[in-house]
Amino acid sequence: MVLGHNERMSRQPRWPVAAGLIAGVALDALIGDPRRGHPVAAFGRAAAALEARDYADSRRRGAAHAAACVLAVAAPAAALHRRTRGRPPWQAITVATAVWAVTGARSLHFEAERACSSLRRRDLAAARAVLPSLCGRDPATLDSAGMARAVVESVAENTSDAVVAPLFWGAVAGIPGLVAYRTVNTLDAMVGYRSARYLRFGWAAARMDDVANWIPARVTAALTAACAPLVTRTSPVSVLNVVRRDGGRHPSPNAGRCEAAFAAALGVRLGGTNVYGGVTETRPDLGDGRAPEPEDIRRAVLLSRAVTVSATALAVLAVLAGDWRLYRRMKKPTTKTISATMATHHSRCSANPAPNRARMTSRARSKSNIVGLLLKPDWLTSTPGGFVKHLE
């Protein structure tokens, strides 16, 4: 049977994507982000240059800017993804490279542990120097407890943004999903603020990021609840109850779920007053525990690592489940397959009718002889020679 181009493409196995997801996460864990020449940093510089040309205090101009940035990166990624389909080694390599480029688990955990060490030494100046690499808050306004809370909240939110969400979109859409998601998330980090400059211009980027993270944030909360007994011995049910109660109270439709899950799992209370670029925001409390301490940062990192492993396994299983469905579909004969087989048989019979008629005549004659033997039982008393004659 000859398959159409679209059908052949849909039947390509996706196990190279699964292999690439595993290899990319392993690469990030082993070598982390490069100090120079990181692809995301290069995109950030290009987006900043484009913003300087496109900026206007307008939602429409901001939406055009966000769309142009996403398309400029996602279109080549889609072409590369299409080119490597049907070439498993190359597809696995390109997916692994993309996963390594867009995930940031190692950097997140490393910076959080640096802040934890500084706070445990009571070196507030060193902790304030680390904080800008984790969040956009003004470190000068924070004391030790405020910085501990800021780091725990950053670990919770970025576990979703920098780990779970890229893996989710990589499992769903391969290289284009990975690259497009990181583009949207980077734009949100650059212009998605409620400041006077970006309130209108950054609106589209912020909404795109909300949509892209809606499912991953809830997956992160569920995985945090599942991993909580391993790290903090907290009941998953109690974590989910806090997420259900407090997650929607956060200004962000996604970050609140992740922060509420970490707060419940760690037994701390998150939320409060934050200062972003001179703008003060007061957020509701998440969780029922005490105020975070430096030691809670270390526990948050352990929990984030457990969620990273779980999210990788879940993404790989989701991709392989698609391959299993493809295998079952290819084994099961479809209506098209049956119709094609019948058409082939009919064409063969039409092309060479004489042997078929002879074969049918021979079968009819044999059937007639057998019926005659059954209707004339005198052969039972005849000689062996007569019996042979009847069969002939």
Question: Where would I find each of the regions flagged by the language model?
Answer:
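Intrinsic low-complexity, disordered N-terminal segments enriched in polar/charged/small residues
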Residues: S368, W379-T381
